[in-house]
Amino acid sequence: IVAMIVVTGSGDQPNARGQALTKGIAAFKSENEKSGSPLFHKLAGRYGTSGCSMGGGGTTYASQADKTLLSSVAMMPWGPVRTGVNVPTLVICGASDGTAPCASHGTPAYAGIPDSVPKMRVEISGGHNGQPSAGGRNSAKYGLAFQKVFLDGDERWLPLLKAAESEETNIK
Protein backbone atom coordinates (compact mmCIF):
# COMPACT_ATOMS: atom_id res chain seq x y z
CA ILE A 1 0.00 0.00 0.00
CA VAL A 2 1.29 3.42 -0.93
CA ALA A 3 -0.61 6.41 0.42
CA MET A 4 -0.41 10.02 -0.60
CA ILE A 5 -1.87 13.07 1.06
CA VAL A 6 -2.60 15.93 -1.30
CA VAL A 7 -2.77 19.30 0.42
CA THR A 8 -4.48 22.08 -1.47
CA GLY A 9 -5.47 25.55 -0.38
CA SER A 10 -8.44 25.57 1.96
CA GLY A 11 -10.42 27.56 -0.59
CA ASP A 12 -9.75 25.15 -3.45
CA GLN A 13 -12.95 23.82 -4.97
CA PRO A 14 -13.57 20.11 -5.67
CA ASN A 15 -12.31 20.40 -9.27
CA ALA A 16 -8.92 21.69 -8.09
CA ARG A 17 -8.73 18.96 -5.46
CA GLY A 18 -9.62 16.31 -8.04
CA GLN A 19 -6.97 17.66 -10.41
CA ALA A 20 -4.43 17.43 -7.58
CA LEU A 21 -5.42 13.78 -7.03
CA THR A 22 -5.06 12.91 -10.73
CA LYS A 23 -1.68 14.68 -10.90
CA GLY A 24 -0.52 12.78 -7.82
CA ILE A 25 -1.55 9.46 -9.35
CA ALA A 26 0.17 10.40 -12.62
CA ALA A 27 3.34 11.11 -10.60
CA PHE A 28 3.14 7.66 -8.99
CA LYS A 29 2.70 6.04 -12.41
CA SER A 30 5.66 7.98 -13.80
CA GLU A 31 7.91 7.09 -10.85
CA ASN A 32 6.97 3.43 -11.23
CA GLU A 33 8.34 3.50 -14.79
CA LYS A 34 11.41 5.67 -14.16
CA SER A 35 14.65 3.73 -13.64
CA GLY A 36 16.50 5.14 -10.68
CA SER A 37 13.28 5.97 -8.87
CA PRO A 38 12.81 4.30 -5.48
CA LEU A 39 9.38 3.23 -6.78
CA PHE A 40 10.70 1.72 -10.04
CA HIS A 41 8.56 -1.34 -10.82
CA LYS A 42 7.40 -1.58 -7.20
CA LEU A 43 3.82 -0.39 -7.59
CA ALA A 44 1.13 -2.91 -8.48
CA GLY A 45 -0.69 -0.53 -10.82
CA ARG A 46 -3.88 -0.47 -8.73
CA TYR A 47 -4.96 3.06 -7.94
CA GLY A 48 -7.87 4.47 -5.99
CA THR A 49 -8.78 7.75 -4.36
CA SER A 50 -10.45 8.95 -1.22
CA GLY A 51 -11.21 12.37 0.16
CA CYS A 52 -13.40 14.20 2.63
CA SER A 53 -15.78 17.13 2.11
CA MET A 54 -14.46 19.16 -0.85
CA GLY A 55 -11.83 16.43 -1.20
CA GLY A 56 -14.72 13.94 -1.40
CA GLY A 57 -16.11 16.01 -4.25
CA GLY A 58 -12.61 15.95 -5.71
CA THR A 59 -12.60 12.16 -5.72
CA THR A 60 -15.64 12.15 -7.99
CA TYR A 61 -13.85 14.60 -10.28
CA ALA A 62 -10.79 12.32 -10.35
CA SER A 63 -13.02 9.31 -11.06
CA GLN A 64 -14.51 11.11 -14.01
CA ALA A 65 -11.11 12.22 -15.32
CA ASP A 66 -9.03 9.05 -14.79
CA LYS A 67 -10.69 5.88 -16.08
CA THR A 68 -7.78 3.74 -14.84
CA LEU A 69 -8.84 4.17 -11.20
CA LEU A 70 -10.19 1.02 -9.57
CA SER A 71 -12.04 2.62 -6.66
CA SER A 72 -13.13 5.87 -5.12
CA VAL A 73 -14.26 6.71 -1.59
CA ALA A 74 -16.03 10.06 -1.24
CA MET A 75 -16.50 10.87 2.45
CA MET A 76 -19.03 13.60 3.21
CA PRO A 77 -18.63 14.79 -0.41
CA TRP A 78 -19.28 18.46 -1.05
CA GLY A 79 -19.68 19.72 -4.57
CA PRO A 80 -21.59 19.39 -7.79
CA VAL A 81 -22.85 16.05 -9.03
CA ARG A 82 -20.59 14.51 -11.70
CA THR A 83 -21.69 12.59 -14.72
CA GLY A 84 -19.44 10.07 -16.40
CA VAL A 85 -18.15 8.48 -13.19
CA ASN A 86 -17.39 4.87 -14.15
CA VAL A 87 -15.26 3.89 -11.16
CA PRO A 88 -16.63 1.78 -8.28
CA THR A 89 -17.54 4.40 -5.70
CA LEU A 90 -18.43 4.46 -2.02
CA VAL A 91 -20.21 7.60 -0.86
CA ILE A 92 -20.19 8.08 2.92
CA CYS A 93 -22.38 10.81 4.33
CA GLY A 94 -23.20 11.89 7.85
CA ALA A 95 -26.78 12.14 9.08
CA SER A 96 -25.84 15.23 11.14
CA ASP A 97 -23.67 16.92 8.51
CA GLY A 98 -24.58 20.59 8.21
CA THR A 99 -21.82 21.37 5.69
CA ALA A 100 -22.50 18.66 3.08
CA PRO A 101 -25.93 17.26 4.03
CA CYS A 102 -26.76 13.82 2.67
CA ALA A 103 -29.89 15.06 0.91
CA SER A 104 -28.12 17.79 -1.06
CA HIS A 105 -24.65 16.30 -1.57
CA GLY A 106 -24.08 12.60 -0.76
CA THR A 107 -27.35 11.19 -2.08
CA PRO A 108 -27.22 13.15 -5.38
CA ALA A 109 -23.55 12.14 -5.82
CA TYR A 110 -24.57 8.49 -5.42
CA ALA A 111 -27.56 8.86 -7.74
CA GLY A 112 -25.36 10.46 -10.41
CA ILE A 113 -23.26 7.30 -10.76
CA PRO A 114 -24.71 4.94 -13.39
CA ASP A 115 -26.34 1.77 -12.09
CA SER A 116 -23.92 -0.23 -14.27
CA VAL A 117 -21.07 0.86 -11.96
CA PRO A 118 -20.60 -0.79 -8.53
CA LYS A 119 -21.61 1.83 -6.00
CA MET A 120 -22.64 2.17 -2.39
CA ARG A 121 -23.95 4.97 -0.20
CA VAL A 122 -23.60 4.72 3.59
CA GLU A 123 -25.23 7.22 5.92
CA ILE A 124 -23.61 7.29 9.35
CA SER A 125 -26.01 8.20 12.14
CA GLY A 126 -24.63 11.15 14.08
CA GLY A 127 -21.91 11.58 11.45
CA HIS A 128 -20.81 15.12 10.61
CA ASN A 129 -18.45 16.77 8.15
CA GLY A 130 -15.38 16.48 10.38
CA GLN A 131 -16.20 12.95 11.50
CA PRO A 132 -13.61 11.11 9.34
CA SER A 133 -10.74 13.26 10.63
CA ALA A 134 -12.05 13.25 14.21
CA GLY A 135 -11.56 9.53 14.71
CA GLY A 136 -14.62 8.42 12.78
CA ARG A 137 -14.18 4.67 12.90
CA ASN A 138 -17.12 3.90 10.64
CA SER A 139 -15.75 6.02 7.80
CA ALA A 140 -12.41 4.24 8.11
CA LYS A 141 -14.02 0.80 8.41
CA TYR A 142 -16.24 1.15 5.35
CA GLY A 143 -13.61 3.03 3.34
CA LEU A 144 -10.96 0.37 3.96
CA ALA A 145 -13.37 -2.47 3.21
CA PHE A 146 -14.43 -0.84 -0.07
CA GLN A 147 -10.82 -0.26 -1.15
CA LYS A 148 -9.89 -3.85 -0.24
CA VAL A 149 -12.75 -5.21 -2.36
CA PHE A 150 -12.16 -3.03 -5.42
CA LEU A 151 -8.41 -2.36 -5.31
CA ASP A 152 -7.30 -5.79 -4.15
CA GLY A 153 -10.22 -7.91 -5.35
CA ASP A 154 -10.56 -9.30 -1.81
CA GLU A 155 -14.22 -10.22 -1.42
CA ARG A 156 -13.73 -11.32 2.19
CA TRP A 157 -14.47 -7.67 3.04
CA LEU A 158 -17.93 -7.70 1.42
CA PRO A 159 -19.79 -8.82 4.58
CA LEU A 160 -18.49 -5.76 6.40
CA LEU A 161 -19.86 -3.49 3.68
CA LYS A 162 -23.19 -5.27 3.62
CA ALA A 163 -23.53 -4.85 7.39
CA ALA A 164 -23.46 -1.04 7.11
CA GLU A 165 -26.08 0.63 9.30
CA SER A 166 -27.86 2.56 6.55
CA GLU A 167 -26.93 1.79 3.02
CA GLU A 168 -28.01 1.84 -0.57
CA THR A 169 -26.03 -0.27 -3.02
CA ASN A 170 -25.98 -2.30 -6.20
CA ILE A 171 -23.04 -4.42 -4.98
CA LYS A 172 -23.94 -8.09 -4.78
Where on the chain are the PLM-derived regions?
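Gly/Ser-rich "nucleophile elbow"/oxyanion-hole loop immediately N-terminal to the catalytic nucleophile
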Residues: 13-57
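Hydrolases whose catalytic domains are alpha/beta-hydrolase-1, hotdog thioesterase
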Residues: 58-62
